């Protein structure tokens, strides 16, 4: 390793170590690439240059004949890895003493910070106090909607968003959140309405157009899906979800979209969607192995489940069933397979599956377990449903 860190960049972790003859520069690369490493002193004079090939997990070492105090900058192919200048920022770290936290805005700020930290349960009291101070405070209503969506109270989130829209019908966040809640509630027209208004703004255009593409693909309107997927990429070319929707809509229109798959692969080389789609298009053993061989983590079943649920969310049940049939499987997967096929025999198998160390957390699994409870009444589906809540 680097035995410490002087700086961290998107190219790698860098450390400088003083030696008897100068300074050893150690870089632990984050990606495989060929680079030109250039070292400058504090006057800006280049004192060393080396071309090298980097690979993750293989630290690169280079020694220069000057002390660490004399170094000014280390560059890698035009990207700064380390600098000797003072990078202390001027951003304030303490709130003004005369700021009144006991206001709708003050409580919203506290709640919003906690949401950014993903402390949703701790954020909710502040959101409630915010709209308690002012029941028509739109940011507070939006924050409450976010928190209700997070715990799958879609109707509550929808109601909060509608109250915000009653105050400001063009508020972008309220429209987007209303669309998300309506989408989960099956209120497709309301969802489209919210996303269309949210898409008028730069902040929400990409996300809203991505959601609209999903709705159109799910409804079988693939040409509209293509249009909105393309719009989602304007100003956000690395929107992988938008690229996936562009591929799906194009594929459903029997259009060649291999270039889209390649674009996703360039952005995210380990994306399971890319490898599965190549297997789906050509289901031979080579493509099957290529898909499954890179799912190597300790909870591989979650990769399969996540991909299958995504396919199901856009109406691609056949693909979802195929993904789950290739999964190592667990109790949640078993219930999903029974639900997708509405198969009594698969449900009976799920009802005797081992639920040890199975901890469902996705809201999409709620209707699956509710269906299983209604169909068989086995304790396992009730237990797993309770874990989601």
Go through each PLM region and give its residues:
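Long, contiguous interaction/recruitment modules in multidomain scaffold/adaptor proteins
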Residues: 2-102, 274, 283-284, 346-348
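Alpha-helical segment of the N-proximal tetratricopeptide repeat
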Residues: 100-133, 303-314, 355-360, 384, ...
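Structural marker of alpha-solenoid helical repeat scaffolds
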Residues: 133, 167, 201, 235, ...
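Structural signature of tandem alpha-helical TPR/SEL1-like repeats
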Residues: 118-125, 150-163, 184-197, 219-231, ...
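TPR alpha-solenoid repeat register
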Residues: 140, 174, 208, 242, ...
């Amino acid at each position: 390793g680097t035995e410490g860190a002087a700086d961290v960049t998107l190219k790698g972790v860098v450390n400088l170590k003083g030696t008897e003859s100068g300074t050893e520069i150690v870089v632990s690369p984050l990606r495989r690439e060929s680079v030109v490493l250039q070292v400058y002193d504090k006057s800006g004079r280049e004192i060393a240059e080396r071309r090298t090939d980097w690979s993750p997990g293989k630290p690169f070492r280079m020694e220069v004949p000057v002390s660490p105090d004399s170094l000014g900058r280390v560059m890698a192919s035009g990207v700064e890895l380390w600098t000797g200048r003072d990078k202390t920022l001027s951003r304030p770290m303490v709130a003004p003493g005369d700021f009144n936290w006991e206001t709708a805005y003050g409580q919203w700020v506290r709640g919003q910070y906690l949401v950014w930290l993903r402390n949703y349960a701790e954020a909710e009291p502040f959101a409630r106090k915010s709209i308690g101070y002012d029941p028509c405070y739109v940011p507070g209503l939006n924050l409450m909607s976010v928190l209700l969506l997070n715990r799958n109270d879609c109707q509550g989130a929808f109601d909060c968003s509608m109250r915000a829209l009653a105050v400001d019908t063009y508020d972008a966040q309220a429209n987007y959140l209303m669309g998300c809640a309506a989408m989960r509630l099956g209120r497709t027209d309301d969802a489209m309405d919210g996303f269309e208004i949210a898409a008028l703004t730069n902040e929400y255009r990409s996300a809203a157009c991505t959601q609209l593409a999903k709705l159109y693909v799910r409804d079988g309107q693939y040409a509209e899906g293509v249009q909105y997927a393309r719009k989602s990429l304007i100003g956000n070319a690395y929107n992988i979800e938008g690229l996936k929707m562009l591929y799906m809509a194009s594929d459903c229109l029997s259009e060649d979209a291999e270039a889209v798959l390649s674009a996703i692969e360039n952005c995210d080389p380990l994306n399971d969607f890319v490898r599965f789609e190549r297997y789906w298009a050509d289901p031979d053993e080579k493509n099957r192995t290529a898909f499954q061989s890179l799912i190597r983590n300790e909870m591989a079943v979650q990769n399969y489940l996540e991909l299958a649920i995504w396919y199901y969310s856009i109406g691609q049940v056949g693909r979802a069933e195929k993904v789950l049939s290739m999964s190592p499987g667990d109790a949640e997967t078993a219930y999903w397979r029974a639900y997708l096929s509405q198969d009594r025999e698969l449900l009976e198998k799920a009802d005797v599956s081992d639920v040890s160390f199975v901890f469902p957390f996705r809201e999409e699994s709620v209707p699956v377990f509710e269906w299983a409870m209604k169909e068989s009444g086995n304790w396992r589906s009730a237990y797993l449903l309770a874990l989601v809540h």
